[in-house]
Amino acid sequence: CIALTPAQLGAARWPAGAPGLSCVSEEDALPFADLSFDRILLVHGLESAESARRMLREVWRVLKDDGRVLVIAPNRTGMWAYRESTPFGNGHPYSIRQLDRLLAAGLFRAERRDAALWMPPTRMRLVLRAAPLLERAGRRLVPGLSGVTIVEAVKDVYAAMPVRAVARRRLVLAEAG
C-alpha cells in the first residue's frame, strides 16, 4: 500500500498506525516506473487536480496493461459537494457522465459505476445513528443525490491515441475582374 499525497499538501501517513509507504508527488509526474501497478484507488484526487486529464494520463502510464483504477469523486448533485466543511466541498464535483468522458479521454474504459454516501453532512447524534437506514433509503429513493460517485475503469490499451488536427490550407480563388 502506497499513499500518494499532492506535493502542495505535504506527506500524510496512511494508513495510520499500519505498515505502508507514504510519499508526495506532482499529480502529472508520478514517481513510479511505467506499468508498476495492478490497481490504483483514486480518492480525493480528481476533484482537486489542476489538470484531471494529465493526472489520468499519469495513472494510465503507471498501470499495467490489464490494470484497473477505482475513482471516487464528489457527486455534482449530492449535498456533500456543497459543504465546504467536508473534503468533498473543496474542488470540482463530477456527474457520472463527466467521469465517463474524462476517463475515456484518459484512455480508460468505465466498467462499473456505483454511488455511496447518502448520509447528510451533519454531526447530530440522532441522524448519525440513523446512518444505515438513511444509506439504504437514499440508494432506493434518491439515487442521484449520493455524496460520491464511484467508477471502476480498466486501462484501454487498444484505444485510439488522440492526435492533434493538422492545419490545412484552403485555396480560395477570386474572380478576375
What label would you give each PLM region?
Residues 53-68:
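A short glycine-rich, Lys/Arg-flanked "PGG" loop and its adjoining helix->strand segment in the class I
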Residues 111-136, 144-146:
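Conserved catalytic loop of SAM-dependent methyltransferase domains
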Residues 1-29:
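Class I SAM-dependent methyltransferase SAM/SAH-binding core
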Residues 136-141, 145-177:
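C-terminal lobe and adjacent flexible extensions of AdoMet/dcAdoMet transferase-like proteins
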Residues 38-51:
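A short SAM/SAH-binding and catalytic strip from SAM-dependent methyltransferases
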Residues 89-113, 117:
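Short alpha-helix
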